[in-house]
C-alpha cells in the first residue's frame, strides 16, 4: 500500500458525527472506507465505494472535494490543520480495486432496459440496472461513452483512459451493451 495514502488515512479523527460524510452529495461512508483501508481490507473498501457510487474512480479525480467532504472535515476547524484529503484515499482505493474487477454479469431477471445517453447519470443507472439483473443497452449519439465527462472535462483533469477502463470493467465485463 502507498505510504502517503495510509499516512493520510491515519490523520482521520474518526468523528462520531462525521461532517465529511454529511458534506458528500452521495453520502459516501468515508469513516468506514478509511477504517477498512487502515485494517488492510482494501477489497472491502473498494467494494463499498463502487456499491455506493459506480463512478467513484471518476469522482475521485473531478469531484469538488474542497467544498464537500474535505471542506466539511472537522480538522479544518483546528488552527493550522489541513483536512483529511479523502480525494487521495478515494483515488487510490478505487483505482486499485477497479484494476481487480473481473466479475461477470449478475444473474438475469428476464427484463430488458434501455438507457439513453452515456453521461454520468446514464452510466450510473446502467450499472445499477445490470446489478439488479436487467439486460441493459445504452444508446448514445457519440462513438465513445462518457458524455460531458469525456467531451466537457479536459483530459488533464479526467484522462480518457479512466472512461475507457470504466467501459471495459463496468460495461463490457458486466454484459452491458453500448450502441
Q: Where would I find each of the regions flagged by the language model?
A:
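Beta1-alpha1 glycine-rich phosphate/pyrophosphate-binding loop at the start
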Residues: 27-39, 49-50, 72, 77-87, ...
Amino acid at each position: 500500500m502507498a505510504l502517503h495514502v495510509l499516512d493520510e488515512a491515519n490523520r482521520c479523527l474518526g468523528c462520531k458525527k462525521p461532517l465529511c460524510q454529511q458534506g458528500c452529495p452521495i453520502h459516501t461512508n468515508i469513516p468506514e472506507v478509511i477504517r477498512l483501508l487502515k485494517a488492510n481490507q482494501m477489497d472491502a473498501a473498494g467494494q463499498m465505494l463502487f456499491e455506493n457510487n459506480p463512478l467513484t474512480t471518476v469522482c475521485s479525480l473531478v469531484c469538488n472535494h474542497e467544498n464537500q467532504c474535505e471542506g466539511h472535515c472537522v480538522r479544518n476547524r483546528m488552527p493550522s490543520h489541513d483536512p483529511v484529503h479523502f480525494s487521495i484515499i478515494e483515488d487510490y482505493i478505487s483505482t486499485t480495486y477497479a484494476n481487480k474487477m473481473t466479475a461477470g454479469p449478475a444473474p438475469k431477471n428476464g427484463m430488458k432496459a434501455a438507457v439513453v445517453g452515456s453521461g454520468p447519470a446514464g452510466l450510473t443507472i446502467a450499472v445499477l440496472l445490470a446489478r439488479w439483473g436487467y439486460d441493459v443497452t445504452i444508446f448514445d449519439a457519440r462513438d465513445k461513452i462518457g458524455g460531458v465527462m469525456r467531451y466537457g472535462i479536459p483530459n488533464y483533469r479526467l484522462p480518457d483512459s479512466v472512461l475507457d477502463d470504466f467501459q471495459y470493467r463496468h460495461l463490457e465485463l458486466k454484459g452491458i451493451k453500448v450502441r
